[in-house]
Amino acid sequence: MTKRKANHVINGMNAAKSQGNGAGYIEDDQLVLTAEQRQNNKKRKKNQ
């Protein structure tokens, strides 16, 4: 079996088409973050 690419890596997979453009998760924005900002970008701050 070949290893499948994760869905969040495929471009446009997170876009919410039924809610119109721009309603989905902004994927390209994540690449702009610095290393320090990435540390504070976790979902749950409580567990840090």
UniProtKB/Swiss-Prot annotation:
| Coiled coil found in the keyword field | no
Keywords carried by this UniProt record: Sporulation
Which compartment or compartments is the protein found in?
A: Spore core
Give a Gene Ontology cellular component term annotated to this protein.
endospore-forming forespore
Can you tell which superkingdom this protein's organism belongs to? Bacteria
A GO term (biological process) for this protein? sporulation resulting in formation of a cellular spore
InterPro entries noted in UniProt:
SASP_SspO
Chain residue ranges for the region called Disordered: 1-23
What induces the gene encoding this protein?
A: Expressed only in the forespore compartment of sporulating cells.
Q: Which Pfam families would you find in this protein's record?
A: SspO (PF08175)
Keyword field contains Chloroplast:
no
Mainly localized where? other
Q: Report the family membership.
A: Belongs to the SspO family.
Q: Which NCBIfam families match?
A: spore_sspO (TIGR02864)
Q: Which HAMAP family match?
A: SspO (MF_00665)
- Know the name of this protein? Small, acid-soluble spore protein O
The organism encoding this protein is Bacillus pumilus (strain SAFR-032)
